[in-house]
């Protein structure tokens, strides 16, 4: 299948696992790791209300540290941050810059 993609750096791989981030890096894509609700937080969204905020923050930090191992271009907590990341990527692409 030819998708007509000339430059893979115009695409973004968003994932919550190191395997997914590595897939994106191997394809030459920008990569974004999402920490909250990541597999590495080990919590279901429906159970979050029953958890202590300190525990949630500890798990979130551990999730970020785990995601850093795959060296994504960006790590965000939630997808709400994605528009800012896309804007940054567009600036880098327009100026032919890499991170």
Question: For each predicted feature, which ranges?
Answer:
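Asp-based, Mg2+/Mn2+-dependent phosphohydrolase catalytic module
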Residues: 1-99
